[in-house]
């Protein structure tokens, strides 16, 4: 079964082109399930599954342990350990994906996860921030430093185009057309879309592109956003930078790069953009996903009404 885990991860990496973040989560989730099965089968713990491992020493973990009962007991154990509902849902989803892979490749012939469902997640509305808070965040990076100038450009692009963090780090030089202010984005499922950026954001990006220190550090000839060593920025490094600027600006630590995506989508809607256009810009496969912003917009309107009404 260990070899099947590795084959599945290789499939995700090479065929589905999953991001490093996604692969890392799959490794965490499958290792958790593997440890549970080893405990159930009274087997000695084996080395964690890791794609970085060059020599894969595969200990025996029989598929006979992978049953409906074992999956059900695993979910029950996670609940008893008070794991977050979202964590349980994600781990079960990873096992279901692994099971489907095994069936497709005729490793197993029945799906042990078919009738097992994770906990229901409460529908959480995104919490956008105000335009004033966006401005405060934008003003935080130190523009006298190359990295600060780059980070201001990142923030401008987040708010200009509503991109995912993984989409921003994947941008190459030739993806940006400054004549039309369009960026070719590779989104989820390798789907490409053209996303406009504001002239204001385009101006910042052009200045960054010609920044003298950028030319000095450049080692990756493809990547647009570079770290101080000239390599492509990672999602993790942007996350760290983002949290640093939140601390410096005094804004809430619960704000994330994805919050900016929610924010601009809400602002687009409030300024009259239709849902189909917002769906296309954000790269949502379903209009239902985009519809959540109508609820957010109404929630904000009700809040403003209550705060402004003389009888409130």
Curated annotation (Swiss-Prot):
The keyword Cell membrane is annotated on this UniProt entry: no
Domain Core-binding (CB): 1-103
A Pfam family recorded for this sequence: Phage_int_SAM_4
Location of the active site: 164, 188, 258, 261, 284, 293 (o-(3'-phospho-dna)-tyrosine intermediate)
Keywords: Cell cycle, Cell division, Chromosome partition, Cytoplasm, DNA integration, DNA recombination, DNA-binding
Matching HAMAP family: Recomb_XerC_XerD
Protein family: Belongs to the 'phage' integrase family. XerC subfamily.
Name this polypeptide is given: Tyrosine recombinase XerC
Gene source species: Chlamydia caviae (strain ATCC VR-813 / DSM 19441 / 03DC25 / GPIC)
Gene (name only): xerC
């Amino acid at each position: 079964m260990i070899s099947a885990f590795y084959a599945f991860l290789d499939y995700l990496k090479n065929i589905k082109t999953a991001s490093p973040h996604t692969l890392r989560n799959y490794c965490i989730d499958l290792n958790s399930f593997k440890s549970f099965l080893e405990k159930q089968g009274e087997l000695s713990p084996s080395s964690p599954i890791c794609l970085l491992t060059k020599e894969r020493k595969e200990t025996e973990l029989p598929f006979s342990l992978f049953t409906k009962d074992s999956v059900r007991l695993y979910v029950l154990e996670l609940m008893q350990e008070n794991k977050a509902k979202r964590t349980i849902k994600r781990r079960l989803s990873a096992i279901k994906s692994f099971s489907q892979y095994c069936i497709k490749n005729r490793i197993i012939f029945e799906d042990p996860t078919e009738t097992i469902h994770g906990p229901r997640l409460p529908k959480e509305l995104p919490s956008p921030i105000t335009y004033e808070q966006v401005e405060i965040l934008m003003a935080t990076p130190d523009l006298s430093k190359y990295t600060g100038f780059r980070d201001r450009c990142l923030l401008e692009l987040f708010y200009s185009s509503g991109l995912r963090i993984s989409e921003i780090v994947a941008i190459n030089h030739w993806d940006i057309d400054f004549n039309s202010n369009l960026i070719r984005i590779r989104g989820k499922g390798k789907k490409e879309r053209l996303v406009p950026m504001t002239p204001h954001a385009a101006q910042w990006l052009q200045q960054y592109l010609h920044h003298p220190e950028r030319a000095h550090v450049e080692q990756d000839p493809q990547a647009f956003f570079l770290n101080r060593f000239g390599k492509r920025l990672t999602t993790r490094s942007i996350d760290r930078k983002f949290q640093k600027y939140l601390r410096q600006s005094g804004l809430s630590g619960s704000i994330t790069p994805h919050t900016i995506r929610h924010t601009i989508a809400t602002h687009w809607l409030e300024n009259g953009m239709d849902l189909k256009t917002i769906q296309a810009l954000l790269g949502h496969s379903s209009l239902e996903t985009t519809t959540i912003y109508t609820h957010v917009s109404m929630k904000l309107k009700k809040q403003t009404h209550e705060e402004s009404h003389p009888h409130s």
